[in-house]
UniProtKB/Swiss-Prot annotation:
Signal peptide: none annotated. This is SsrA-binding protein. Required for rescue of stalled ribosomes mediated by trans-translation. Binds to transfer-messenger RNA (tmRNA), required for stable association of tmRNA with ribosomes. tmRNA and SmpB together mimic tRNA shape, replacing the anticodon stem-loop with SmpB. tmRNA is encoded by the ssrA gene; the 2 termini fold to resemble tRNA(Ala) and it encodes a 'tag peptide', a short internal open reading frame. During trans-translation Ala-aminoacylated tmRNA acts like a tRNA, entering the A-site of stalled ribosomes, displacing the stalled mRNA. Gene3D superfamilies: 2.40.280.10. One of its GO terms (cellular component) is cytosol.
């Protein structure tokens, strides 16, 4: 499992509750662009239509002279019971479904998605403060 890209904003802005692995339906030029790390997950999110999951706002740069939609919604490959379970939890608990990592798994590109709860500004400030305290203590002890 080789990670292609991480969604660092997701870990800062959300509290991760459950994680899932999903396959992606991609075109050839999209795979080539991803292989060259020309992909961004910042601002991407998961939507549901007709019991199918799609990733929206995932930016894949165009490969050479191939013309295609860079922000096109791409279908995720999940089992029906997984989709229903995620949708149910999302609607019942008002959670967000966000992408965490894009990675290679046996020559297939997979996406790790998560059910997440948004953090408040106070939570984010508290996290930054904890991080600073840890750094300060580390400097003092060494």
């Amino acid at each position: 499992m080789k990670i292609i890209i991480k969604n660092k904003d997701a870990f800062f802005n959300y509290e991760i509750l459950e994680k899932y692995k999903a396959g992606l339906i991609l075109k050839g030029w999209e795979v080539k662009s991803i292989r060259e790390n020309k992909v961004q997950l910042k601002g991407a999110f998961i939507t549901f239509k007709n019991d199918e999951a799609y990733i929206t706002n995932m930016h894949i740069s165009q490969y050479m002279s191939v013309k295609g939609n860079e922000l096109e919604p791409r279908k995720l490959l999940l089992n029906k019971h997984e989709i229903r379970h995620i949708q149910d939890k999302k609607n019942r608990n008002s959670l967000a479904v966000i992408p965490l990592n894009l990675f290679w798994d046996n020559n297939y590109i997979k996406l790790e998605i998560a059910l997440a709860k948004g953090k408040t500004k106070a939570d984010k400030r508290h996290r930054i403060l904890e991080k600073d305290v840890r750094k300060h203590l580390k400097k003092i002890t060494y």
